[in-house]
A protein has these predicted regions:
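A surface/secretory-pathway sequence property marking extracellular, secreted
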Residues: 106-108, 122, 126, 345-394
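Sec-dependent signal peptide cleavage junction
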Residues: 15-34, 500-501, 525-530
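Von Willebrand factor
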Residues: 63-123, 149-153, 164-174, 178-180, ...
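C-terminal membrane-anchoring or membrane-association module
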Residues: 518-534
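Acidic, polar low-complexity linker/tail segments
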Residues: 24-71, 78-84, 488-490, 494
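Von Willebrand factor A/integrin I-like adhesion domains
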Residues: 130-134, 167-173, 229-362
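Low-complexity, intrinsically disordered segments enriched in Ser/Thr together with acidic residues
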Residues: 390-453
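Short, charged loop segments at secondary-structure junctions
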Residues: 80, 114-152, 157-160, 177-180, ...
């Protein structure tokens, strides 16, 4: 009988997931007031016994806390109309808090010659809504220090380390006209500068007020110095780097000329109080943008042409409506955004496994050939989301047909399966969060060894103000598995017995002898039987 020995070593499956939240994947390009980045993540589950993994795309990131900060920095002269729009945004945020159970913190700064914290950054509740509304309506007078207002707002946002930077919003409402500034981030004490009265054709010193600009430039009440706001701001920055700027000229604002004549500006090329105030305001605004905060500049009213132009410059060269800000605070991306996802070369997408949820609600779907519709009537003319699969390329396009809420992540899941027969040995690299490091280590992932569930997944976002954002790449989860080979061994060969001729002959002789005796006995027995019968 043939013996077959089969040995099987145990299989060990290891898989990783990868997640990239907005802000953790670096993006190139200048920070702008528009769509800067979009929170997003992509994860994969551990391979099961059939070498399958569930991949999940999420907008915003599934790992992100659904908490936001909103700080209003309001000019003392903010109109009642804009205050009402701010209150409408506040009411909508209150609905999100009530309906979705999310956390939104709100702060209010009112500024004149200094910044006044009318309401510290506090979690929005039904109980404090009225108090916040009163803070927004608060009126004060005397002075205009935009730098102070932004410093106070920035401090609020900086101090809250529990909220992701891109979920921090600063809404700056001003006419852009300013002539006071602060030193060493102290937003409670205003400073100014003043030209020597001899430079003023009218004679008297202007006491560090807005009128100092009239000493420096002619016709400034109806025009922009240097021909445009961009030229002027560039010129100011250049002079700030020369001896046309000196901190010794700064003095605490009192409404009077400096008591020390050495502080008086003697040259019209010197950086004036208005110019330094504008420069520091813009620098603080940009610093917040570079920190990832979403800053929104809204023109409160038109007083001076250069003030209006300055606010539009902060807003990216365009006027910003309060309604568009409200949309940005509430939503991550708008209708028309798409995701193009290509499955990894080592995997195949498993048909019929798409699943989509909004918040905690799983949407109904209908599959029509290679197209799957989610939500609405689930057809080509009425759907919330659509997925079109390309079998030849093993890729799909996800179309988003509604704004995606910052407070209710949209998650698309599907299953991939390892293509072909698992090869013996260890393959892939564990990278559960897609940060480029092997899980639970500080070791960089070797991309040549990674086993990516996807070749790529690209988000092409539409901003909430309708603008087209730059393409953003999702992370690529990498998985790992270890499989043993099957071993087969031939059965042992039969033992061949060698019989010598002598032994063989003796054996035959014995056999013949025994046979002969047996035969003789049989004959004898037969004879006896025959006689008895007779």
């Amino acid at each position: 009988m043939r013996r077959i020995s089969c040995f099987l070593l145990m299989l060990t499956l290891l898989l990783t997931t990868a997640v990239v939240a907005w802000g953790t994947v670096p993006t190139d390009g200048e920070v702008t007031p528009g769509l800067v980045n979009v929170s997003r993540s992509k994860t994969a589950t551990v391979l099961d016994k059939d070498y399958r993994s569930t991949v999940t795309l999420s907008l915003p990131s599934a790992e992100e806390k659904l908490a936001s900060d909103v700080v209003f920095v309001l000019d003392k002269s903010t109109s009642a109309e804009l205050e009402d729009k701010a209150l409408k945004l506040l009411a909508d945020l209150q609905k999100e808090v009530t309906n979705r159970g999310v956390m939104v913190k709100v702060g209010v700064v009112i500024f004149n010659q200094a910044a006044n914290v009318a309401f510290p950054l506090t979690e929005l509740t039904e109980g404090n809504y009225a108090t916040i509304a009163d803070a927004i309506r608060e009126t004060i007078s005397n002075g205009s220090n935009t730098h102070a207002g932004l410093l106070a707002g920035k401090e609020m946002l900086d101090d809250d380390t529990a909220v992701e930077p891109h979920r921090k919003h600063l809404i700056f409402v001003s006419d852009g006209v300013t002539y006071q500034f602060c030193k060493e981030d102290d937003y409670t004490t205003p400073y100014t500068r003043s030209f020597d009265g001899s430079l003023n054709s009218d004679g008297p010193n202007q006491c560090g007020t807005l009128s100092e600009l009239n000493v420096q430039y002619e016709g400034v009440e109806t025009s922009i110095p240097k021909g445009s706001i961009d030229n002027w701001m560039s010129d100011i920055a250049g002079r700030m780097r020369t001896d046309n700027d000196n901190e010794d000229w700064d003095y605490q604002y009192t409404g009077q000329a400096p008591t020390d004549n050495s502080k008086l500006l003697k040259n019209k090329e010197n950086v004036s109080n208005v110019e330094k105030a504008l420069h520091l305001t813009e620098s603080t605004y940009k610093a917040m943008q570079e920190s990832g905060y979403q800053c929104h500049a809204v023109l409160a009213r038109e007083i001076r042409q250069w003030g209006t132009a300055f606010m539009n410059r902060l807003a990216g060269g365009r006027a910003v409506a309060f309604d568009s800000i409200q949309h940005k605070v509430l939503y991550a991306v708008d209708k028309g955004s798409t995701v193009a996802d290509t499955v990894g070369k080592s995997f195949d997408l498993v048909p019929g496994t798409f699943c989509l949820t909004v918040g905690v609600q799983e949407l109904q779907y209908k599959q029509d050939g290679n197209v799957t519709y989610f939500g609405g009537d689930q057809n080509e003319s009425n759907y919330r989301f659509k997925i079109e699969y390309d079998g030849a390329a093993d890729s799909f396009t996800w179309e988003i047909n509604e704004p995606v809420s910052n407070f209710a992540p949209v998650k698309l899941s599907y299953t991939v399966k390892l293509a072909g027969t698992p090869a013996a040995g260890t393959h892939g690299v564990m990278d559960l969060n897609g940060d480029g490091y092997v899980d639970d280590t500080t070791t960089h992932v070797d991309v040549s060894k990674a086993l990516y569930t996807n070749e790529s997944a690209i988000l092409t976002p539409v901003a909430t103000d309708g603008g087209q954002g730059e393409a953003l790449e999702f992370p690529k989860p990498s998985v790992s598995y270890t499989a043993a080979a099957y071993y087969y061994s031939e059965p042992p060969a039969p033992v061949k017995r060698t019989v010598s001729p002598t032994t063989f002959d003796a054996g035959i002789a014995v056999y013949v002898e025994v046979a002969a005796l047996s035969l003789a006995g049989a004959v004898k027995l037969c004879g006896r039987r025959g006689r008895r019968d007779a």
